[in-house]
Swiss-Prot record:
Example of a GO cellular component annotation carried by this entry: plasma membrane-derived thylakoid membrane
UniProt key word Thylakoid: yes
Summary of the function given for this chain in its UniProt record: Essential for the assembly of the photosystem I (PSI) complex. May act as a chaperone-like factor to guide the assembly of the PSI subunits.
GO biological process: photosynthesis
Subcellular compartments: Cellular thylakoid membrane
TPR repeat residue numbers: 35-68, 72-105, 113-146
Organism whose genome encodes this protein: Thermosynechococcus vestitus (strain NIES-2133 / IAM M-273 / BP-1)
Membrane-related topology note: Peripheral membrane protein
Domain of life: Bacteria
Protein name per UniProt: Photosystem I assembly protein Ycf3
Keywords noted in UniProt: Membrane, Photosynthesis, Repeat, Thylakoid, TPR repeat
Family indicated by similarity: Belongs to the Ycf3 family.
Pfam families (alphabetical): TPR_1, TPR_7
């Protein structure tokens, strides 16, 4: 039984009913509607921490979805799951795939920066200082790109860029 049919949460159930109504009236293909249903079930499973189920739904959605922007969000969510599981290389792979389809996705740029910053911190703690600086520089590059797309977001990243001397712009917003 699809997750959307067994949801106990009133708000999620309401969202599902609304999404189903919208899907019925939208002039889109049956394949796109099925892809969205898988995507919606993937988001629901992900929100519940059911990552294996979410990944199955996202993979099914990817097989059906043809729209590049919609595919980018599916790939992004797969990246989120891998990042949550500490699988940084896999997460980076999916975030980059999402950006290939949708280069104006600041949240993917931010998450790539967060991973590179984390890897830099790990390298720094292990006294691999040159490697740490390379990771920090990569993080800075991705944060700058994210901030350019969403200047009012990522305030902590903006502060980090300034305090580490990696900012070439005084104020982003």
């Amino acid at each position: 039984m699809p997750r959307s049919q067994r949801n106990d949460n009133f708000i999620d159930k309401t969202f599902t009913v609304m999404a189903d109504l919208i899907l019925k009236v939208l002039p889109t293909s049956s394949q796109s509607k099925t892809a969205f249903a898988y995507y919606r079930d993937g988001m629901s499973a992900q929100a519940d921490g059911e990552y294996a189920e979410a990944l199955e739904n996202y993979q099914a959605a990817l097989e059906l979805e043809e729209d590049p922007t919609d595919r980018s969000y599916i790939l992004y969510n797969i990246g989120l799951i891998h990042a949550s599981n500490g699988e940084h290389e896999k997460a980076l792979e999916y975030y980059h795939q999402a950006l290939e389809l949708n280069p104006r996705m600041p949240q993917a740029l931010n998450n790539i920066a967060v991973i590179y910053h984390y890897l830099g911190t790990q390298a720094e703690e292990q006294q691999r200082l040159e490697e740490a600086e390379q990771f920090f520089d990569r993080a800075a590059d991705y944060w700058k790109r994210a901030i350019q797309l969403a200047p009012n977001n990522y305030i902590e990243a903006q502060n980090w860029l300034k305090t580490t001397g990696r900012s070439n712009i005084d104020v982003y917003f």
